[in-house]
Amino acid sequence: LPGIVSGTELWCQGYSEPGAGSDLANVKTKARFDETKNKWVINGQKVWTSLAHESDWCFVVARTDPDSVAHKGLGFFLVSMHQPGVTVRPIEQLTGTSEFNEVFFDDAVADDILGAPGEGWKVAMALLGFERGVSTLGQQMLFQNELDEIVRIAKANGAAKDPVLRQRIAEAHTGLRLMRYNAMRMLSGSDDGSLDKSSL
């Protein structure tokens, strides 16, 4: 959790799949419990995964019961993106940038499962509820990391001495702090009930 809050660890969501889009009821990615490793092992593919190429971890929705149908028999797994069983292929957009990715899991090991096997649908729906309201927090952390890199480069090449650049960096920093505080306000308001779902 400290890495998430500080923005030093970035997460992506492994929901959408080829042929199923964002229809979680048709997830084909499979998870099986490996008794020798005492861990869940993931096999399958996700697509349109935002920022997977920059992420450290992925929330992966996978089918724990191969005989289950629809939203039953799903698990919600925490998977490190830095392991041999994970392959990320950026999808190039018309602009030449790549925000979205294909992600392949080939015997990738999940560090943990949230909830019990079969409760993945419930966990995923709860997460989507938060995401719709406080997604700005993730954006803020990404932008803050980018601004920190700009400051580092400006200090290294001497551009930080330019008063115009310093003013622009200060304005960007102020805007990012406001963005963060607003997201935190929404989070705390959601917890104490002072903000309902429509406010998020």
Regions found by a protein language model. Name each.
Residues 1-17, 35-38:
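FAD-binding glycine-rich core of flavoenzymes that anchor FAD
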Residues 1-2, 6-7, 51-57, 176, ...:
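Internal helix-loop-helix
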Residues 11, 15, 48, 57-59, ...:
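Tryptophan-centric aromatic hotspots in well-structured domains and transmembrane helices
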Residues 19-27:
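Active-site-adjacent elements of ketosynthase-type condensing enzymes
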Residues 20-21, 47-52, 94-95:
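Glycine-rich phosphate/pyrophosphate-binding beta-alpha loops
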Residues 29-32:
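A structural signal for short hydrophobic beta-strand segments in well-ordered beta-sheet cores
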Residues 39-89:
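A short core secondary-structure module
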Residues 86-182:
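Glycine-rich beta->alpha junctions and the first turn(s) of the following alpha-helix
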